[in-house]
Design a protein with these regions (language model features):
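C-terminal output helix
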Residues: 108-120
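Acidic, metal-coordinating helix/loop segments flanking the phosphotransfer/catalytic sites
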Residues: 30-50
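Active-site residues of response regulator receiver
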Residues: 53-54, 84
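Conserved acidic segment of CheY-like receiver
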Residues: 1-19, 51
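Short, glycine/charged-rich "phosphate-handling" switch motifs in NTP-dependent
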Residues: 101
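Receiver (REC) domain active-site loop signature in two-component systems and cognate sites
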Residues: 57
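A short, hydrophobic beta-strand element within the central beta-sheet of small alpha/beta folds
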Residues: 77-87
Length: 128
């Protein structure tokens, strides 16, 4: 299962479509903010194989969520891919320093997003 965390319903839907286009059989859950995502992770969602995390969200931003995940013994080993519209190198550096497993910049065309996610899945969720 993959957890998509983004405050934009459109971006969540795009991520789901792009994941489906990779050809992998994957279940997807979503959360519209960081607090909801952490609650889902800590209260019975089950551990996802991968988290796609938006960086710029109201309330608890992606970096704060990522730090919470990395500081939680039960969650810290989950690969977290930051997916953000920020083109700033300082944001990439901050995400990596906070523990991001990978970093994708949006907006991407659907075919490009699917290709990028396919690479991410291959790297973090190899087919067995």
């Amino acid at each position: 299962m993959i957890l998509v965390v983004d405050d934009s319903p459109t971006d969540i839907e795009l991520a789901i479509i792009a994941l489906e286009a990779t050809g992998r059989e994957i279940s997807v859950c979503s959360a519209s903010d960081g607090k909801s995502a952490l609650a889902m992770l800590r209260n019975g969602l089950g551990l996802p194989a991968l988290i796609l995390l938006d960086m710029k969200m109201p309330g608890m931003n992606g970096i704060e969520v990522l730090r919470e995940i990395r500081s939680d013994y039960c969650l810290r080993d989950i690969p977290v891919v930051v997916v953000t519209s920020s083109a700033l190198e300082s944001d990439r550096t901050e995400a990596v320093a906070a523990g991001a497993s990978d970093y994708l910049q949006k907006p991407l065309a659907l075919d490009q997003f699917s290709k990028e996610l396919g690479s991410v899945l291959h790297r973090w969720l190899p087919v067995t």
